[in-house]
Amino acid sequence: MKVRQKMKKPLIIAAIVFGVGFLSIIGYGLYLYMSVNSTASEIHEPLDREFSEKRGAQVDVEGKQPMSFLLAGVDSTGETHAGRSDTIIVLTVNPNDKSIKMVSIPRDTRTEIVGRGTIEKINHAYAYGGVQMTVDTVENFLNIPIDHYVSINMEGFKGIVDALGGVNVNNEFAFNSGGHEFGEGPLFLNGEEALAYSRMRKQDARGDFGRNDRQRQIVEAVIKEGAQLSSITKAGSILDAVGESVRTDLTLSEMWAIQSNYKEAGGNVEQLALVGPSQRIDGLSYVVISDEDRNNMTQLLREHLELD
């Protein structure tokens, strides 16, 4: 007669705990998978084109071809696509030398608005024709392809920073902004503080140029923090924040490929800026970028994109 041995109580408890934990992991993984797909669908808004005319073909993401992004920050309390793009940043990403170049374009830059045939401030393009007109205008201004875009409602951006658990920046001088005090030196900022930090310009002798520097700091900090994200428990809140404030033409498969093939470039970010004198023309104040400075930046970015 076979004798059935009783399983010791501690082993039964351990088995139950392991089983519950395993099922929880599977359940959470399924939740994340569904959430990622849902968020990717929610934020996906393609451009009215297959690829940039200045490139002539789609970027080979799997082949690790250098690519460019337009980051448009819309300082608005309304919908993501309302208002003007007060933040215009171009990112070129080269996975071969594992580097990113981040270029700020002043919002008051005087240039042709493609699609209207007028010479105005570059941030007017967003108000007239959304991200499509902004992409076309920036491409024409810098003479480089803009392969993809990411549009962010800056009011909602603070939710992304909070979901990441905050970001680190290095402040050049002490100032107050939005009811917050920012001391000189290394700072750790939550979402509300990061937004106030990036908006300040009146206490900076450089005005919008200083503001642009702080915006680039925050963007770089988010890129680095996102790349180093180790806790899977943050993923749900990050997806919620992204869904509320971000729009992009990237598909989910492209996002996965970029995460896999381009992420190492995030550890080497060079911050650049186009600067120029402020001039009053027809009663309006513009930033006028010289042809020499613009052409030099174009050459630098085209080389980084391996186009020349």
What is the predicted function of each stretch?
Residues T118, G130-V138, N153-I160, A194, ...:
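Stable alpha-helical elements in mature extracytoplasmic
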Residues N123-H180:
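Amphipathic, coiled-coil-like alpha-helical scaffolding segments used for oligomerization/assembly
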Residues P95, R110, V114, A127, ...:
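Sec-exported extracytoplasmic/periplasmic mature domains
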Residues S76-T80, E120-Y128, N143-H148, K202-F209, ...:
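Second-shell loop/turn segments in exported
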Residues E45-D48, S52-V59, Q65-P66, T118, ...:
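C-terminal solvent-exposed extensions
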Residues K6-D97, A257, I289:
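Entry/capping segment at the start of metal-dependent catalytic domains
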Residues I160-S237:
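Flexible, polar/acidic helix-loop-strand segments at domain edges
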Residues K64-M67, G83-I88, D97-I105, G117, ...:
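Extracytoplasmic
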